[in-house]
Amino acid sequence: MTPQQLTEEYIFAHDLREASAKIYRAATKALLKHFGPTATVQDVDHRAVLGWRRKVLEQGLSKRSWNTYSNHLRTIWGYAIEHELVTHSQVNPFRKTTVIPPRRASKTVAAEAILRARSWLSMQVGAERCTGDRARITPAWFWLCTFEVFYYTGIRLNALLCIRKRDIDWDNQLILIRGETEKTHKEFVVPITEGLVPHLSRLLQEAEKAGFADDDQLFNVNRFSPHYKSKTMNSDQVEAMYRKLTEKVGVRMTPHRFRHTLATDLMKAPERNIHLTKCLLNHSNIQTTMSYIEADYDHMRAVLHARSLAQGALENVRKVDYSGSPQASAKPKPCGQPLARVGEVPPPEARTEPSEPREHTQETGIQRGPTSWEAEAVPQPPDTFEQSVLFTLMAQHLSNRAATASAVPAATSGSGGRGSAARDSLA
C-alpha cells in the first residue's frame, strides 16, 4: 500500500471538512516529494522520517510547517496501524518527530493601516460608481463588505465562505455560523454592529436582485460580476484580494490577522472580558484565546511606572549632579532671580539683597559643592556652568599659591639672601 492510498482511506473513514482533507493530502504530497512517487509504506520508517526532517529544515522549511506534516501523517499512520492496514510494523514512524517552534508575536494589524485600507477600498467603490470602469478589485462594494465583516466579527475565512443567505437574521441583527463549517464544530452567532449594517444591507439587496435562494452561498463574488466564471467563491479569491490590499497599503493583511487584532483590541478595552472574547472567536479554551492577544506595551509601561512611583524609585533618578560636566539633557532648576553672567554687573535698581553667607570648608575656604548640599539635605543653590568653571579655576589658583608659599621657607632656611630674592620674584 502507498502513502497516498493510506491517506485516502483515512479521509474516507472520517467526516472531515474540505479544508482539513486538503491539509492531509498536502502533507502526503510533501512526503512523496521526498521519498519518491513510487514509495511504499515499508519505505517510511522512523530513521527515514528523521532524515527527511533534517533535510527540509536545512532547506528553510519552518518548524511550524514541519510539525503540520508530522502531526497529520502521524494521525494517518496511527489509523492504519490500529485497523491493520499496515502489518509490517506496529511502530508509528512519525512518533516523536515534531520540533519546538519559536514563539512568534501575535500577528495584528495596526489601526492606522486598517484605516488606510478602508479608505482605499472606499475610493475604489466611488471610482466604479462614477466612471463605470472596472476597479482593480471588482466589484469594489463587495470586497469592502467582505473586509468589514472580517474587521467587525473576526470570523474565520471558511466561516465566511459557508454563510448562506438564510444565516443572516436581520430582525435580531445576528449572523449564524453553523457548527459543520467551524474548526471547533461548535455553532455560534456574531452580532451585526452599526458599522456593518450598511454593507450587509447592500449585499442582501444585491443578492435579492441576483435571485439568491435561501441556501445559496451569500459571499459569492462570482454571482455579482460577469468577470468571474466559477460557481462558488473559494479561499483563493479572498486571499488574492488581500494580497492586492497588502501591496497597496504596505502592511500584511489576512482574515486571520484580523482575528488576532480583534482579540487584542477587546482585551485592551477598559471593560476587557476574556470570556466574551473567547465566545466571539469561538475558541475551545481560554489558552487559545490568550495566544491570540498581543501584549499591550503602553499599559505595561504605565504599570511599571506606577510601581516605581509607589516604591519611591524615581526620587533618586530625578536628582542631577551639576558638579561634573553638563549633559545636553540635564537642565538646571528654574530660580526666581536669574544670576548675572561673569563680567555683567546689574544696574543699581536691579541688584538684589546680599544672600546669607554660606558654609566654607576649612582646607580651602571654598564653599562646598552640590554633593555636600545633597548629603545634608539642604536645597541646592542655583548654579550655572560658567560660574562652576570660574570657581574651579579660582580654587586651583589659590591651592597652587598656598602650596608654593609653604615650600619657600624650607628652601630659604639654608640660603637667606637667595630665599628673599625668590620670595620677591614669586610676589
Curated annotation (Swiss-Prot):
Residues 350-362 have a biased composition (Basic and acidic residues). Residues 116-305 form the Tyr recombinase domain. Coiled coil: none annotated. It holds the Pfam family Phage_integrase. GO terms for biological process: cell division; chromosome segregation; DNA integration; DNA recombination. GO terms for molecular function: DNA binding. InterPro entries: CB, DNA_brk_join_enz, Integrase-like_cat_sf, Integrase_catalytic, Integrase_recombinase_N, Tyrosine_recombinase_XerCD. It is found in: Cytoplasm. Transmembrane segments: none annotated. Keywords: Cell cycle, Cell division, Chromosome partition, Cytoplasm, DNA integration, DNA recombination, DNA-binding, Plasmid. The active site is at R156, K183, H256, R259, H283, Y292. Residues 323-384, 401-427 are annotated as: Disordered. PROSITE patterns: CB (PS51900), TYR_RECOMBINASE (PS51898). Its main location: cytoplasm. Residues 402-413 have a biased composition (Low complexity). CDD domains: DNA_BRE_C. It comes from the Bacteria. GO terms for cellular component: cytoplasm. Residues 1-81 form the Core-binding (CB) domain. Belongs to the 'phage' integrase family. In contrast to other XerC proteins, it has a longer C-terminal part. It is found in the pKLC102 plasmid, which can integrate the bacterial chromosome at the att site of the pilA hypervariable region. Site-specific tyrosine recombinase, which acts by catalyzing the cutting and rejoining of the recombining DNA molecules. This is Putative tyrosine recombinase XerC. It comes from Pseudomonas aeruginosa. The gene is xerC.
